Curated annotation (Swiss-Prot):
NCBIfam families: PRK00668.1 (NF001908). This is Nucleoside diphosphate kinase. Belongs to the NDK family. Major role in the synthesis of nucleoside triphosphates other than ATP. The ATP gamma phosphate is transferred to the NDP beta phosphate via a ping-pong mechanism, using a phosphorylated active-site intermediate. Pfam families: NDK (PF00334). The gene is ndk. InterPro entries: NDK-like_dom (IPR034907), NDK-like_dom_sf (IPR036850), Nucleoside_diP_kinase (IPR001564), Nucleoside_diP_kinase_AS (IPR023005). It is found in: Cytoplasm. Homotetramer. It comes from Anaplasma marginale (strain Florida).
Amino acid sequence: MMFEKTLSILKPDVVERGIIGRVLSYIEAAGLRIVAQRMCALSHEQAEAFYAVHKARPFFPSLVGFMTSGPVVVQVLVGESAVKTYRDVMGATNPSEAAPGTIRGDLAESIDANCVHGSDSLENAEWEIKFFFKEHEIMSSMPNGK
């Protein structure tokens, strides 16, 4: 088995609506384990730095505005093929295109308030995890704690 780490962000809409537990149930049902987690409020500068890859895109200002509109929950998830597994459980970016049974298909309200962010590659996962967590803040990466 190939265990990987990926980053998850539960966006401000999830925190505001009080559905953190519901989102976590999808993550756990997919066989992913949370090995680091914290709630924080992103500054404008942090959000711009984190989403810098989208800086030239027309949605960048609204993305930064949304991500700084309230607290978020950042997590490191681990599991077999974690990047792909989490992207599958998140569903399509646009909730109207997301399959039922996915986080976005079941819970998201709009393309902006789409509940979650997940790393899109192993390379980005590594960078994104380091953006939010120091190595000592991440528990054992093996699902059985070994």
